[in-house]
Amino acid sequence: MAKRRQKKRTHAQLTPEQEQGIPKSMVIRVGQTSLANHSLNQLVKDFRQIMQPHTAIKLKERKSNKLKDFVVMCGPLGVTHLFMFTQSEKTGNVSLKIARTPQGPTVTFQVLDYSLGRDIKKFLKRPKSLNNDDVLNPPLLVLNGFSTSKRSGEDDQDVNVEKVIVSMFQNIFPPLNPARTSLNSIKRVFMINKDRETGEISMRHYFIDIREVEISRNLKRLYKAKNNLSKTVPNLHRKEDISSLILDHDLGAYTSESEIEDDAIVRVVDNQDVKAKHSQSLKSQRTPVEKKDNKEREKETEEEDVEMEEPKPSENLQPTPRKKAIKLTELGPRLTLKLVKIEEGICSGKVLHHEFVQKSSEEIKALEKRHAAKMRLKEQRKKEQEENIAKKKAVKDAKKQRKLERRKARAAEGGEGQGKDDAMSDDESSSSDSEHYGSVPEDLDSDLFSEVE
């Protein structure tokens, strides 16, 4: 299969500063119990669809991976948020921990119930599946039920907890600039609603479908019934006039859930229509300056151009708003959360707030002293470990140095021994030659070696 072509020439590339300002996330599972849960695995995959495109969509966890392994990689990869799904071995409760890297804090929620995306599609009449174009931009974040101002009957601690949660949710997606953001690029919405009475937080993920509305819904049903025989015609025997059918809003109760509601119809100004009207007005204002007779025009050559007047800008050109209907289709997953605690750091630090456990000031001071003693002991052990490592390294380096010196000494001794052996071999060869030629008599007749004539 051929690889799909990507736009490179006209696509706007982000600068390194802009890429650094975009928040990125990782959605992972931590713990042996959570890795063995198949439904939780599918929930993690569905939650990654929400966080697209700035998330690790194809991340695979191993049983040997620990939380520290992911935290270490957050810095080089530029990850700003960690979403950790865990499951307790004793109770089996599923928890969602949202941590801000690298300093924290970490907000822990208990997942009361959740529904997967495939379960939601079974109950929808017209389910929607996401394409690659639908996840090119992050979803629109909508927060409802959260208040950062102090109300009557609320403590300062509750207000601070609310501020931490709101700031945590607001920073998981890049901020929108109304002047630069195109409305057509926003195709998804992530809704987070808090119930003020129970304190439960519900998460929903929807797809935004915008359709143009030119006629009323009742007339559209009549047009569809004309072209499609399977569509049922509304019962008109109780209607006196056709206007009663058009103006009757109670007829909408008999339509399906997937159709667009009248309350969702808004008026939107489209810039493309303004540009089109402006171009049409310019064309209509263009008139020839020189009017010649037909005989003179026939004599002119084809190379001559007819001079045109400069068009005047139309003062009465105003954009006409169009009616557009907004329809939301749920994609999933659904989550219902309950706040448990807020702690410093990434899953290891001082507990700033706990929803179910309340400590007195004396208990808090005792815990702080115990924590300080643990930190001092940890630093002491760390220093001892570093000193031991340095000692072992020094011993190892000294051993290597002695080994190199022995090798050099052996090489030098081997060179001297080889020189002595060569001298002894030369003496032996010279003595053997003298002994061989010494047995030849001196008065040997020289005619034996004379040349033959």
From Swiss-Prot:
Phylogenetic lineage: Eukaryota, Fungi, Dikarya, Ascomycota, Saccharomycotina
Residue stretches of biased makeup (Basic and acidic residues): 288-300, 374-398, 410-423
Basic residues bias spans: 1-11, 399-409
Biased amino acid composition, Acidic residues: 442-453
GO biological process, one term: ribosomal large subunit assembly
Known role: Required for biogenesis of the 60S ribosomal subunit.
Predominant location category: nucleus
Region (Disordered): 1-22, 275-324, 374-453
Membrane recorded as keyword: no
PANTHER family, sorted: PETER PAN-RELATED (PTHR12661), SUPPRESSOR OF SWI4 1 HOMOLOG (PTHR12661:SF5)
PTM-bearing positions, type Phosphothreonine: T301
Name of the protein in question: Ribosome biogenesis protein SSF1
Cross-referenced InterPro entries: Brix, PPAN-like
Keywords: Nucleus, Phosphoprotein, Ribosome biogenesis
Residue span, Brix domain: 26-348
GO cellular component: nucleolus; preribosome, large subunit precursor
Compartments reported by the entry: Nucleus, Nucleolus
